[in-house]
Amino acid sequence: MNLSDRERRDLVSQWAFDTRPILGRMHLWLENVEVEWLRGKQTPEFTKNISFMDGRMERLMTMTAAVTALGTQLFGRFGEGKDKTKDELNRVKKDADAISAYAMSESLWYATRQLPENHAVLVCMGEGLMPKVGETKEMGSNPQLGFGRVYARPQVAKWLDGRVTRLLNQKNYGWAEFREDIKNEGITVWGSAIDTLENTSRFAKGKPTGPLTVMHLFNQPLHITKPYEAYMGNLFLPIKVVRKAEEKSVLLDFMTPRKKVIEAIEETYPGIKRKNIHVWTLGGKSREKRLGWLWKQWNDLGVHLVEDGWVLPSGGKAFIDSGTYAPTYLVGTWIDGNKQTQLFLLDGYAASAEAMQAASLTPALDLDGTLVTFTSKFELPIEKERFVMRLKPGQPDFKQKLEELFQKTVDQDTVKKYTRMIMEAREAEMPLHHRVIRAHDFFPEKNWDVAAFSGYMCDDPYTGARGVECIDDQIYRVTTRISTPRAGKRVTFTLRLMEKPKEQRLIFNPLLIRFIYGEDFRTRPVKISDSGRIRNELQTLCSEALEYQSNGKILIRFDRIPPEVISLKDQKILREVLEWYKKHHPIWFHWLDMPS
């Protein structure tokens, strides 16, 4: 849409006004805004919102995605892990995760101060508990925004924090009690699933495509009661294919033999050539044990398994080493230059947060998405892994059924490990009792809604979105996307840094990291907001070391912080910082507890 100079100035002015809490916090100046409608009926900006949120909250959340992408790209050590040792690469990845998580957390903190007084955002699923590719369990979880993080006005946040603590600590306080308390208090809770940096390895290695930030907001909390992360099998198809199969009483989902899927595709798109059916799955030799059975099914059917470097409709090149979320936007058909129908679909597995995010896109993209919960280890091939979470550890034949899947005798340690993984999913109240999971199974109420926000650090070949572009040393263009069942828009911001690079870097770095790197915390003026800021940073940087006490305090156990996450030297500085704040500002930091 072409805008006159006056219309453009008005557009920028309103966006700047609505998003000023985030722009001010991050010391950014909004130079320009470009809005491109991708789906839905185009209406003049500011006349109609496209989600369950009001227009201002849509703009604040869109800016949150933009600021996270910009800050991570500029200050997250992009490309510094290239050709480095495994340990050095993982250090870069964790630093990148820390910047992205901090930028999004700070933006959400300021954005949600504009919520109605009885509203809150609750993070229900995050990405970072499991080791990333190339990491081991000993390296600890990654900086993240995970389950239980609350963003709201202070009184609402304090009240909701207390209920989340009860969910974590009290066995007799579950989802039913949590939901009843929310209703009785008259509070509206928006759930969220967040991955602050998708494709972290590609980011650390300096790959030109892939890295993005993803935040999904829902009009209700997800039915999940504990921090949980594992793998999930997933299959995404155009809804037309599933509807066509239903006409012949054929059920299409992740558990369906792929031969039946192909038959339904050919019924839906008469004359489509199998070589023009493109199936995207994660690839690589390391995944052959997990996915070999699935790859064989597709290869035997004569379809095209997407390979690394395959040219996409956008002109960009596919990658299959990571990144299961972005390809969801491409699922569907198009007509090529030879007037032949091409179909792209998504199969395989993903981490649970990414899988849930992709599944919740289905009403916005006219897709059908089905999931199956796997374990966090995924040691069995996919054809067996998909049955593990249905086993019942309390049954006498549990060990026997496990051995049938492994096709060998398993020791008691293996039995205990699988018992623990299954029980973790049950305790988090993951929906395990269905043949497959669809997005609506995560929600307590049927009328659920979603607003999906993406911010692109680098070019995205699946949607054609551009990554962060440098105009000059102070001005950058940042592309974002908002997708809802009503419409979809691409919003590109031109943002100017208001500080010199050294000062701007400090703004995007967690306060605790600045202290660890040498900033003098003793001479820095202390504000009451530092209490909440440091609390949030601890939850982001070392969540596994925190214990939430029934009296509202948080106990930090330094022995649970892996040195790969925070070195022993830096842990010593961190303890010194926290002890100083606790001693000199005991009222503001009454929530902080540390063993002697």
In which residue ranges do the predicted regions lie?
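RNase H-like, two-metal
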Residues: 250-251, 555-564
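Conserved mixed alpha/beta catalytic, RNA-binding, or beta-rich assembly cores of soluble enzyme
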Residues: 208-274, 280-425, 429
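Flexible, acidic active-site loops/lids enriched in D/E/S/T/G that coordinate Mg2+ and/or position polar
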Residues: 101-220, 311-320, 325-326
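Flexible, charged surface loops at secondary-structure boundaries
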Residues: 115-117, 185-186, 269-275, 335-340, ...
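Gly/Ser/Thr/Ala-enriched C-terminal appendages of enzymes
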Residues: 342-548, 552, 564, 575, ...
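General structural feature for long, well-ordered alpha-helical segments within catalytic domains
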Residues: 7-11, 18-25, 42-45, 49, ...
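Alpha/propeptide regions of enzymes that mature by internal proteolysis
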Residues: 51-119, 249-262, 274-280, 290-309, ...
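Conserved phosphate-binding loops in N-terminal lobes of ATP-dependent enzymes
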Residues: 2-106, 118-119, 208-262
